[in-house]
Amino acid sequence: MTRYIFITGGVVSSLGKGITSASLGAILEAQGLTVTLLKLDPYINVDPGTMSPFQHGEVFVTEDGAETDLDLGHYERFVNATMTRKNNFTTGRVYADVIRKERRGDYLGGTIQVIPHITDEIKAKIREGADGADVALVEVGGTVGDIESLPFLEAIRQMRIELGDQQTLFIHLTLVPYVAVAGEIKTKPTQHSVKELRSIGIQPDILVCRSEQPLPDAERAKIALFTNVPEPSVISLSDVKSIYEIPLILRDQGLGNRVCEKLNIKATAADLDDWKKVVQAQKNPRHTVTVAVVGKYVDLEDSYKSLSEALIHAGIHTQTRVVIEYIDSEAIELHGTELLKKVDAILVPGGFGSRGIEGKILAAQYARENGIPYFGICLGMQIAIIEFARHKAQMENANSTEFDPKTPFPVVALVSEWMAKEGIIEKRKWGDDLGGTMRLGGQPCRLKIDSLARRLYGEDRVIERHRHRYEVNNDLIGELEKKGLVISGRSIDDRLVEMIELADHPWFVGCQFHPEFTSTPRKGHPLFIGFIKAGLAAKEAKKAVLAAPSQEKTD
C-alpha cells in the first residue's frame, strides 16, 4: 500500500518545495522505505521542453527521455530512485489527455468538466507515478491561491477523502518573514496561507516554515495555535549555506518520525552518515579552483542548475571549493578573451540558437591554444568541433547547419537517424515539431581504448542522457582526425560521435550528452571530477611558472 505525502506552498513562490520534498525523501529512504517523488506543474505547456530557460530555468531530462521540471533533478540528487516521465506532468498534459479521450469517445458523449474529469485524470496520473513505492511525495507546483493550481488541490483533497488520513498526509511550506524595520518575525502571512488552504478543504498536517533564522519556540507555538497544527508538527527551516544540510536539519527536528507516526509506518532510525560526509567535505575544502561557465543564459543561474550542482559535487569529491564564474558569451564577442585570463578551467554548456555562438568559439580556441582544461557539453562539444575545424583543419567558415545552413564545411548537422538503447531506429527531419522531437534520454556510448574518456569512466561502455537535434557530421570527421582530433566515444551502432578529446592537450574533452543529469552529491560524476582535478593541476602549473623567475634570482 502506497502512502501519499502532498507538499504545497504558500505566501510566495520559490520557497524550496522541491528541495524540501527531496530532503524528506532522503530521510524516509534512510529509514528503509522505497520512495518516489512527483511534481505537478500548473502551467498549460505540455512539458517545459520548448520553454525559454529565462522563463522556466533548466529542463531536466529523465532516463526514459522526458523533458521535465528542474525539481526532478533535485529528486534524483537526493534519493536513489530514477525519475521517469510519470514523475512529472502539467495542466497541459492533463487537458491534452482528457481531450484525446473525449475525441475517442471514452466519455460516452458526456459533458467534460473540471470536476470530475480533469480531477480524475490528475488522480489517475498520481497513482500511476506512485505505483510500487512505499511512499510517494507529491509536490504541487505554484502557490496556494493561484487559479492555475486549483484543479490539483481539488484532486488531492479528494484523495484524502478516498484514502483516509492513514494513507495521505498534507505538508504546507510557508514563509515566515523577518521585518527589519519593526525588528519582528511576522507569522500573519503563514496564518493567511493556511486559511486559504483550509478554504479549499485541506487542513495541513505539518507546516514547514521558511525563515532567515531558526524560529523561536514562542513563534512556533503561535503558528500552531492559529493554524490548528500541533506544535511538534511546526517545523523550522531557516536559510543554510548548503542545500545538502537540509536532510540533517529536518531529521534532527523529527520530521521523518513525525511523518511515519501519522501514516502508521514502522520504520528504522534514519542513517544519514552519507549526508554528514557530504556536508563536512563541502564545508572543509583544501583547495580552490575557478571555473568559467561560458553561456547565453547566465542571467538566470537556474538555467544551469544541474551543471552548477555537478561542479559542486566534483568539488566535494576532490576537497575543492569550486568558484563558478558565469560569463555571457556575447561579452566575449565584445571584449575578447580577457575575461577568461583569471580562470583555471573553461566549461561551455548546452544551448540552442545562434546568439553568442562566436563568443563560445573564442572561449574554446583560447582553452585549446593556452592549454587550459576545457569541458564542452552538448553544444559545447559542437563548438569545440567548429573551432578545431576552422583553426586546425583549415576549414574556413566551418559551422553547424543550425547556425549557417549554407556553410561550406557543415561539421555539425541535423541528426536524422539514430539507434535508441532499445535497438529501435528513430528518425527526424526538417520541419518536425520542436516539442519532443530531439534525441532524448539515456543512450549507450562505447568508449575508445586508451582514451582519456575511458580512463575517467573506468569502463568501456556507459549510458548517458541526451537532449539535442544536431550531431557531428561523419563525412568530415576523417579530416579532423588527421589534424589530431580524437573520437573517444561513439554510439553503440558506431554512427554518431558522442565524445571527443585532443591528444596534445592536458585536458580537452567534449561530450554530446549531458553528464550533469546523473551527477549526485554522494557519488559525483567521473567527467566532472576529472575536470576539477585538471583545473587544480592547471592552477598549480600556472603558479609554478609565475614563481620561476623569482626562483632564478634566488639561485
Curated annotation (Swiss-Prot):
The keyword Lipid metabolism does not apply. One of its GO terms (biological process) is pyrimidine nucleobase biosynthetic process. It catalyses: UTP + L-glutamine + ATP + H2O = CTP + L-glutamate + ADP + phosphate + 2 H(+); L-glutamine + H2O = L-glutamate + NH4(+); UTP + NH4(+) + ATP = CTP + ADP + phosphate + 2 H(+). Its EC number is 6.3.4.2. CTP binds at residues 13, 146-148, 186-191, 222. Pathway: Pyrimidine metabolism; CTP biosynthesis via de novo pathway; CTP from UDP: step 2/2. Allosterically activated by GTP, when glutamine is the substrate; GTP has no effect on the reaction when ammonia is the substrate. The allosteric effector GTP functions by stabilizing the protein conformation that binds the tetrahedral intermediate(s) formed during glutamine hydrolysis. Inhibited by the product CTP, via allosteric rather than competitive inhibition. CTPSs have evolved a hybrid strategy for distinguishing between UTP and CTP. The overlapping regions of the product feedback inhibitory and substrate sites recognize a common feature in both compounds, the triphosphate moiety. To differentiate isosteric substrate and product pyrimidine rings, an additional pocket far from the expected kinase/ligase catalytic site, specifically recognizes the cytosine and ribose portions of the product inhibitor. Homotetramer. This is CTP synthase. It comes from Coxiella burnetii (strain CbuG_Q212). The gene is pyrG.
